[in-house]
From Swiss-Prot:
Location of Phosphoserine modifications: 180
Alphabetic keyword roster: Capsid protein, Host nucleus, Late protein, Phosphoprotein, Virion
Post-translational modification: Cleaved by the viral protease during virion maturation. May cause the middle segment to be shed from the capsid.
General remark: All late proteins expressed from the major late promoter are produced by alternative splicing and alternative polyadenylation of the same gene giving rise to non-overlapping ORFs. A leader sequence is present in the N-terminus of all these mRNAs and is recognized by the viral shutoff protein to provide expression although conventional translation via ribosome scanning from the cap has been shut off in the host cell.
Subunit structure: Interacts with the peripentonal hexons as well as the hexons in the facets. Part of a complex composed of the core-capsid bridging protein, the endosome lysis protein VI and the hexon-linking protein VIII; these interactions bridge the virus core to the capsid.
Pfam families documented for this protein: Adeno_PVIII (PF01310)
Record's protein name: Pre-hexon-linking protein VIII
Record GO terms (molecular function): hexon binding
Organism: Human adenovirus A serotype 12 (HAdV-12)
Propeptide residues per the UniProt entry: 112-163
Domain of life according to the entry: Viruses
InterPro entries: Adeno_PVIII (IPR000646)
Site (Cleavage): 111-112, 163-164
Amino acid sequence: MSKDIPTPYMWSFQPQMGLAAGAAQDYSSKMNWLSAGPHMISRVNGVRARRNQILLEQAALTATPRNQLNPPSWPAALIYQENPPPTTVLLPRDAQAEVHMTNAGAQLAGGARHSFRYKGRTEPYPSPAIKRVLIRGKGIQLNDEVTSPLGVRPDGVFQLGGSGRSSFTARQAYLTLQSSSSAPRSGGIGTLQFVEEFTPSVYFNPFSGSPGHYPDAFIPNFDAVSESVDGYD
């Protein structure tokens, strides 16, 4: 085979730290050319050269420009910040309170509270207490988007006074909650960013220069935690 067409170095991922754990050549991907003639060998070399060209183009498109190939801690500006999707929850309904509002009469919005005064009584009757259901959240904020034209009110016709009950079609009302992070994350990268940042590396003429210029990450016993090679100074 031609020495001018190297086998790419395949990177491995260290998920606990979110870093690349070194790279090694994948010789299992080589084609069987031992019994091939010159014409077949030429075609195989053409396929390998085209593969390396695709990898070089992919690395130029997806890799983030940075001073250090595999930094021990990625800054927040270079890390993909995950935005969790909004959470939609069903608003609690109190059917008994809604019926009580309809039968007894209540002011749904605006102005002061309703009070009922009867003949022969100096003080007005206080408005009956209506059970309120509180929604408590932890580290969430309301989303600006309105997911339902119904809003948060039940859709129907209410009778504000009198003894008759209203007939309304109870519909489910939803509330959209969106989580927010307090600060952008820094440190290790995720699997998706690793695949884009560390495409298989094409290293031409790896043994033609000084041994000190050979990347440590391409040595099989490279330790990504200590950023050193076992047995080497």
